[in-house]
UniProtKB/Swiss-Prot annotation:
The lineage of its organism: Eukaryota, Metazoa, Chordata, Craniata, Vertebrata. Gene3D superfamilies: Mannose-Binding Protein A, subunit A. This is Regenerating islet-derived protein 4. The gene is Reg4. One of its GO terms (cellular component) is cytoplasm. Disulfide bonds join C29-C40, C57-C153, C128-C145.
Amino acid sequence: MASKCVRLLLLLSWVAGPEVLSDILRPSCASGWFNYRSHCYGYFRKLRNWSHAELECQSYGNGSHLASVLNPKEASVISKYITGYQRSLPVWIGLHDPQKNASWQWIDGSTNQYRPWSPRTKSEARHCTEMNPKDKFLTWNKNGCTKRQHFLCKYRP
């Protein structure tokens, strides 16, 4: 049986190409979540402060955290998804300054330095990051972590 499956996958990859095969082999995400490049994303239109949003992301399991957004392409995919639901409210992501010394870190441990800060962002007493709706969620603002707003979670299945 296993050899038949392998042959079928080889045949599919030869006939249909790698794009179709990657769709067939794509890991599944939880209901209501979307897939991009082997990660699952959940956008939640619930109002939570940054810490409670992170706890809620963790409660979904699978190593889920507030989302790390690591490059412009990923940001663009996320932007298009969120704007399908709303265009005016900021959305928490997982970048924060836990030591309150401008040492920004991703809550999931990612080390990428992609940081599209909005030129309008303010620094004082703002240690959590939101996606900025004024720029279609493609730039980010620093904001007070106690503000209650929508949030984006991410995990790798």
